[in-house]
Structures are given as structure tokens and as C-alpha cells.
């Protein structure tokens, strides 16, 4: 796994996870998004979905200050599984070196959505954090496959 590394994640505490977590906005109606934001002040949508970056930053900092989000003490990989209908996909979250991207060891999914990638870059710059995944594809890797199978 030469191109990804573990890191100390900043994530919701177990007590707050259900308040913070939200389905992909790609699968939510505008009304559902607004309802979720208005009825749950700790919803991730209040950080991720804001058009005004100053409001996003303010909410993000408040969530850290109130310990809604806490930084893990040790470096880790994070494994997730997304299921929609009859399809499931497993992912591994880690940090990647830009050189791996530059050398085409990984390829970003967001590249195909120029406007979305520009929005994400502004968001990362504003928050000094990457708060959503950047999907990347990589060559088949037995270590990653085994790791995900063990923990899912």
C-alpha cells in the first residue's frame, strides 16, 4: 500500500454519530436536505452543503469546540461500506501523496466533475480539512482487498 497512508481522523463521537451522519446528497431531494439541516443543527449538511464558506467554517469550528467531532489519537485506515438497492461498494479511507496522483498510481473520480472539484478545493482551503471523500481508483491490491474483507 505504497500510495495511501493512515491518518488521525476527525469524526463524530459515538454518541453524536447519528446526528452528524447523512446519506449522500446525490440521493436526497432538496426538501429532504433542507429538512435535515433545519431539524438537526449538528448535521454534516450544515458544514458540507453550505454555499457560504464562512457559515461552513463557523459550524465546523463549533462542532469541534463542542466535541461533536473529535480527532482520533492514533493513525488509522477507515473502512466503509455503502449499499444502495442491490449494489454495495467497500472503500478504504486514507491519505494519498500528491506524487501518487501525479504519477497516475491513483486517479480521482472528481476529475470528471470540474465544477464539483473546484467547489471541493475551495471548501478544503476554507476549512483546512477534507470533509468528504475524494474517490480514487487504483490497481488491484491484495493487501487492500484483504484489509477490507477482514473488517466488513
Model-predicted regions and their roles:
Residues 1-149:
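A cross-family signal for N-terminal binding/gating loops and helix N-caps
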Amino acid at each position: 500500500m505504497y500510495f495511501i497512508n493512515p491518518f488521525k481522523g476527525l469524526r463524530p463521537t459515538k454518541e453524536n454519530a447519528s446526528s452528524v451522519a447523512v446519506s449522500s446528497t446525490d440521493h436526497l431531494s432538496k426538501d429532504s436536505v433542507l429538512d435535515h439541516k433545519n431539524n438537526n443543527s449538528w448535521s454534516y449538511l450544515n458544514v458540507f452543503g453550505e454555499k457560504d464558506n464562512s457559515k461552513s467554517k463557523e459550524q465546523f469550528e463549533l462542532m469541534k469546540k463542542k466535541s461533536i467531532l473529535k480527532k482520533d489519537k492514533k493513525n488509522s485506515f477507515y473502512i466503509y461500506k455503502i449499499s444502495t438497492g442491490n449494489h454495495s461498494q467497500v472503500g478504504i479511507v486514507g491519505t494519498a501523496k500528491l506524487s501518487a496522483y501525479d504519477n497516475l498510481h491513483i486517479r480521482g473520480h472528481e476529475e470528471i466533475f470540474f465544477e464539483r472539484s473546484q467547489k471541493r478545493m475551495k471548501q478544503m482551503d476554507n476549512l483546512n480539512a477534507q470533509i468528504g471523500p475524494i474517490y480514487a481508483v487504483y490497481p488491484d491490491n491484495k493487501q487492500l482487498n484483504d484489509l477490507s474483507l477482514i473488517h466488513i
